Swiss-Prot record:
Keyword Cell wall biogenesis/degradation assigned: no
One cellular component (GO) term of this entry: cytoplasm
Binding site for ATP: 17, 169-171, 237-240, 248, 254-255, 271, 275, 279
PANTHER family: S-ADENOSYLMETHIONINE SYNTHETASE (PTHR11964)
Alphabetical list of Pfam families matching this protein: S-AdoMet_synt_C, S-AdoMet_synt_M, S-AdoMet_synt_N
Subunit structure: Homotetramer.
Gene this protein is translated from: SAMS2
UniProt KW GTP-binding keyword: no
Stated name of the protein: S-adenosylmethionine synthase 2
Highest taxon, organism lineage: Eukaryota
Location within or outside the cell: Cytoplasm
Pathway(s) this gene product operates in, as recorded in its UniProt entry: Amino-acid biosynthesis; S-adenosyl-L-methionine biosynthesis; S-adenosyl-L-methionine from L-methionine: step 1/1
Top EC group: transferase
Native species: Pisum sativum (Garden pea)
Length: 374
């Protein structure tokens, strides 16, 4: 009897996608604040449209931060250097509307900086999920890994000059054929590869397809997953000259599935970018990813989902949940007990154990581009 299989798809976006541009600006602001003041409380949002970028939100910090410079530097480093590519970093309008963190939140979460780390409460209510699978060395889903790496490859060959016709904006999508091995996911082959990338006016559609196959797809997707039936959609809409904020509006926090597991596992709905570690949308998601990855890496399960939940101002989590999808070597309740013994889910202690108060050198900015806790 033939093995029953199914298709699953994950997508990613390039650093020049308008939403991802906003994520990176918000995290560049966070980096700058934490670099000078590790106790900074940051909730920074960004939006963008043609010839305009706005940063807004609540920030309480001792850092001296030039928000406009951060915006322009980030846009320039991505490659937005003229209106022709979607945004001119040096001449676009930059709007800043930053206020202090609410005093009500400040006293409830960290007692206006008087609480010990173990007593710091969650910055808000919410539930976060961590996921891990043994199908790749990164303990990430293959569909998500390949989509993410294709996007990174597009950026690399654009910036190193291999494909000079490329521009910053773009999206990738990978469909993988899997079979379910008693709860574990086993990838068989890549069914479809989709790339839509911004380009200049000089390149032809045939040249785009040839370059993408040779310089982007071939180095990223292992040959064993490609066959004569693999489908390639390379700029299927035709031309894609107008991209970046000129093509679409962008907003922080609209690519949360791309930032996590590509549609696998689950998601609590909270975004990461522009948030300091007291915001459990970020730190809580990071620690449950570490827990799930540890479970799989240590052979307790082949696939695992971990959930944690919080109440605003309360240090201890309300709940911790483990689901091994039936792949556990021991019962899930025993895995849960091990997780609770091994991991401290209090927000202040997460910041210490994962070193989340250290900014600078593009640390959180890099998180905006690729999931760096792989």
């Amino acid at each position: 009897m033939a093995t029953e299989t199914f298709l699953f798809t994950s997508e990613s976006v390039n650093e020049g996608h308008p939403d991802k541009l906003c994520d990176q600006i918000s995290d560049a602001v966070l980096d700058a604040c934490l670099e000078q003041d590790p106790e900074s409380k940051v909730a920074c949002e960004t939006c963008t449209k043609t010839n305009m970028v706005m940063v807004f939100g609540e920030i309480t910090t001792k850092a001296n931060v030039d928000y406009e410079k951060i915006v322009r530097d980030t846009c320039r480093n991505i490659g937005f250097v003229s209106d022709d590519v979607g945004l001119d970093a040096d001449n676009c309008k930059v709007l800043v509307n930053i206020e202090q963190q609410s005093p009500d939140i400040a006293q409830g979460v960290h007692g206006h900086l008087t609480k010990r780390p173990e007593d710091i409460g969650a910055g808000d209510q919410g539930h976060m999920f961590g996921y891990a699978t043994d199908e790749t060395p990164e303990f990430m889903p293959l569909s998500h890994v390949l989509a993410t790496k294709l996007g990174a490859s597009l950026t690399e060959v654009r910036k190193n000059g291999t494909c000079p016709w490329l521009r910053p904006d773009g999206k990738t999508q990978v469909t993988v054929e899997y079979y379910n091995d008693k709860g574990a996911m086993v990838p068989i082959r890549v069914h479809t590869v989709l790339i839509s990338t911004q380009h200049d006016e000089t390149v032809t559609n045939d040249e785009i397809a040839a370059d993408l196959k040779e310089h982007v797809i071939k180095p990223v997707i292992p040959e064993k997953y490609l066959d004569e039936k693999t489908i390639f959609h390379l700029n299927p809409s035709g031309r894609f000259r107008h991209g970046g904020p000129h093509g679409d509006a962008g907003l922080t926090g609209r690519k949360i599935i791309i930032d996590t597991y590509g549609g696998w596992g689950a998601h609590g709905g909270g975004a990461f970018s522009g948030k300091d570690p007291t915001k459990v949308d970020r730190s809580g998601a990071y620690i449950v990813r570490e827990a799930a990855k540890s479970i799989v890496a240590n052979g307790l399960a082949r696939r695992c989902l971990v959930q944690v939940s919080y109440a605003i101002g309360v240090p201890e989590p309300l709940s911790v949940f483990v689901d091994s999808y039936g792949t556990g070597k021991i019962p899930d309740r025993e895995i849960l007990n091990i997780v609770k013994e091994a991991f401290d889910f209090r927000p202040g202690m997460i910041s210490i154990s994962l070193d989340l108060l250290r900014g600078g050198n593009g640390r959180f900015f890099e998180d905006s581009c690729i999931w760096t806790f792989w």
